[in-house]
């Protein structure tokens, strides 16, 4: 059964059996991570087939990231031993992909861009902003609750999403507007 009625008065169950308020920092973190995950799914849906064909590495990273976000959410609510924990290799994969984007598409940082361009690039910007919020929310939980690798992963992910928005616009032939 999907509904239990146990949350009708502003509390919810954590994985360890503890109840907490729905306004608890842990639930704020889980909510931001869930929202980010949904926007990453939307981003993938908005890629044209032509652009998607040129983003195979990035798409695979996003799919891995979606699984990782569930794991970080589980960390936030004290779920034991959840699968898909972020690793140093996941962080390295983001970094290597960003390095390749900068090299192959000359996407070095030379000033801020106004979020927009094609729809998929704009969605990458939305996901980037939500990622920053999720990162702040997980930091509020403290390093005891969230392992350093997860916090570092979220930090790199927002940088990746910024570069991805730029690459999508470049592949779409959409001119970006500098601030």
What are these regions (language model features)?
Residues 1-179:
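Phosphate/pyrophosphate-binding loop motifs in nucleotide- or prenyl diphosphate-using proteins
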């Amino acid at each position: 059964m999907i509904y239990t009625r146990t949350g009708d008065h502003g509390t919810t169950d954590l994985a360890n059996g503890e109840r907490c308020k729905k306004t608890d920092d842990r639930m704020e973190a889980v909510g931001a991570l869930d929202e980010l995950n949904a926007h990453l799914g939307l981003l993938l849906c908005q890629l044209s087939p032509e652009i998607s064909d040129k983003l195979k590495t990035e798409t695979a990273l996003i799919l891995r990231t979606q699984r990782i976000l569930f794991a970080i959410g589980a960390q936030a609510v004290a779920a034991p031993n959840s699968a898909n924990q972020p690793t140093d290799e996941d962080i390295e994969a983001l970094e290597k992909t960003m390095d390749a984007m900068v090299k192959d598409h000359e996407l070095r940082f030379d000033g801020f861009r106004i979020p927009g361009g094609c729809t998929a690039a704009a969605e990458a910007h939305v996901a980037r902003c939500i990622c920053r919020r999720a990162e702040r929310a997980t930091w509020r939980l403290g390093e005891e609750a969230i392992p350093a690798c997860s916090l570092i992963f979220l930090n790199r992910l927002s940088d990746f999403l910024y570069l991805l928005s730029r690459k999508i616009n470049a592949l779409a032939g959409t001119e970006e507007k500098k601030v």
